[in-house]
């Protein structure tokens, strides 16, 4: 410990003590005042959904216990103004410095700029760190014209990065910084992250998930040692242990992406040495996923409007169909397409979906129903346990053809064919659509083609206990083609001659 500075550590989505650059720097320099500030009003339209708030509540309780074991105390504050709360903490503690780790979503970018500005005005030192990415967004010069190049570079960087020990160990001990004046702190319960009506539903989450940074470490080790080797093979399955389940831990910063990268990269090197092709392929695929996460932050950092506008300018003229009844049917899993409906019902029940299913249901909303992609993005934000604004923005823009490297806008994937590919035995369908459980596998992904005798024997009555298709595939393709033509016509009419540079 080189000095005895008084430092406030502002926790946000970095709820861990291991590999936390802001906490490590503050602990090295002197006494520490850890604080988490909850300001619902500032979240605006991106106020976290029920499942996400439940996770945050559990994670904060876990972090509080960990900091207490190190001799410190996490101060929790609920406020109408983050800036005011931080300034109150500075006055109460006599702190001369505030540190935190970067966030890259549109809400945080604006808030962080304001906080830094107000603190500097008052002569308070401010330092922010990269605690969320393998690579800093500032490493790339990003324009709309080179988005694909940036994606390729981030993916390649994650495959080629050295495996040096960049993970910071937890502090052995923290020197607490006491507040001379009263700070209006509260308990985890008083933050209001969970109301009484939500608790019965959240009890189901408790059975399936264990939030907290030390639990994240266990999940990572389990995945790396037992499941990573089959990751590529299992990526085409939507049932069983086919994903890492790390995304909520990464979103809340309970484990650092550098730690995840380091573990996977070490396995990749070992498998390459041993000429284990299956393992190498799996590690490569997983590391490219880490690169995609970095890419989402790089794009949001350079184009903070992406939660509201398409990155490709001509798609701003696409004639989306703002049909609330279709949107409701999609949300409730009543589209008549089993794989889509199973995914949406799983989402509502658990706050979770396999990434492959996320792509399928979002593509259906955008391409089959022509629903505004921003509607789907917002619904994912409201319901996903691991709702991550940067990843969701890029995911929905990708599906809607709004990225240079995204799905072609005219690409229409048949959910029945995808069902046969990713759920060949119909296990996933039967789990989430019990009304179709008795239907033979031959028909389970396209019950509208099944003979009436088969439907009757299986207890299925289309239009009664299971929906008829909300739109016929040929009709959906025709409507999509017309919408694309109208987009091009509108672009020509107003003189939009291509991408903005």
Curated annotation (Swiss-Prot):
**Cofactors:** FAD; (6R)-5,10-methylene-5,6,7,8-tetrahydrofolate
List, in alphabetical order, the GO biological process terms annotated in this UniProt record: circadian regulation of gene expression; entrainment of circadian clock by photoperiod; nucleobase-containing compound metabolic process; response to stress
Q: List the disulfide bonds.
A: none
Concerning what turns on (or off) its expression, the entry says: By visible light.
Q: Quick one: which residues bind ATP?
A: 356, 405
- GO cellular component assignments: cytoplasm; nucleus
Q: Give a short account of what the protein does.
A: Mediates blue light-induced gene expression in addition to its role in blue light-dependent inhibition of stem growth.
* Record note on quaternary structure: Homodimer.
Which named protein is this?
Answer: Cryptochrome-1
Native source species: Sinapis alba
The coding gene here is PHR1
């Amino acid at each position: 410990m080189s000095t005895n500075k008084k430092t406030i550590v502002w926790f946000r989505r970095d709820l861990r003590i291991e590999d936390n650059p802001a906490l490590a720097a503050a602990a090295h320099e002197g006494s520490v005042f850890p604080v988490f500030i909850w300001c619902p009003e500032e979240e605006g339209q991106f106020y976290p959904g029920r499942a996400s708030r439940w996770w945050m509540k559990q994670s904060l309780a876990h972090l509080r216990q960990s900091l207490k074991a190190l001799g410190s105390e996490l101060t929790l504050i609920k406020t109408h103004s983050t800036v005011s709360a931080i300034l109150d903490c500075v006055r109460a503690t006599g702190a001369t410095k505030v540190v935190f780790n970067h966030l890259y979503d549109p809400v945080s970018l604006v808030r962080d700029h304001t906080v830094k500005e107000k603190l500097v005005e008052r002569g308070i030192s401010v330092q922010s760190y990269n605690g969320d990415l393998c690579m800093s967004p500032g490493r790339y010069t990003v324009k709309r014209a080179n988005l694909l190049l940036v994606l390729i570079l981030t993916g390649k960087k994650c495959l080629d990065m050295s495996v040096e020990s960049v993970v910071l160990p937890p502090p052995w001990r923290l020197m607490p910084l006491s507040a001379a004046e009263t700070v209006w702190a509260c308990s985890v319960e008083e933050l209001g992250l969970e109301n009484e009506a939500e608790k019965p539903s959240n009890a189901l989450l408790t059975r399936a998930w264990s939030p907290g940074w030390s639990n994240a470490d266990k999940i990572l080790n389990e995945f790396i040692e037992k499941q990573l080797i089959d990751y590529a093979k299992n990526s085409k399955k939507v049932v069983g242990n086919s994903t890492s389940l790390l995304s909520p831990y990464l979103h809340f910063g309970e484990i650092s992406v550098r730690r995840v990268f380091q573990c996977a990269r070490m396995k990749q090197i070992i498998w390459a040495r041993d000429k284990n092709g299956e393992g190498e392929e799996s590690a490569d695929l997983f590391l490219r996923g880490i690169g995609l996460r970095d890419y989402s932050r790089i794009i949001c950092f350079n184009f903070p409007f992406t939660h509201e506008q398409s990155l490709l300018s001509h798609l701003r003229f696409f004639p989306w169909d703002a049909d609330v009844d279709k949107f409701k049917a999609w949300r409730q899993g009543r589209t008549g397409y089993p794989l889509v409906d199973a995914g949406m019902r799983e989402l509502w029940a658990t706050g979770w979906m396999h990434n492959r299913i996320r792509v399928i249901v979002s593509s259906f909303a955008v391409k089959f129903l022509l629903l505004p992609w921003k509607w789907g993005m917002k619904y994912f934000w409201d319901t996903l346990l691991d709702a991550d604004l940067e990843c969701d923005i890029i995911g929905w823009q990708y599906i809607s053809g709004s990225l240079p490297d995204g799905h072609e806008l005219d690409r229409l994937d048949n959910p029945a064919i995808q069902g046969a590919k990713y759920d060949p035995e119909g296990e996933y369908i039967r789990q989430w659509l019990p009304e179709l459980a008795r239907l033979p596998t031959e028909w389970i992904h396209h019950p509208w083609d099944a003979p009436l005798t088969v439907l009757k024997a299986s207890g299925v009555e289309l239009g009664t206990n299971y929906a008829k298709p909300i739109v016929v595939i040929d009709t959906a393709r025709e409507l999509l083609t017309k919408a694309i033509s109208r987009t091009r016509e509108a672009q020509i009419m107003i003189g939009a001659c291509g991408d903005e540079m």
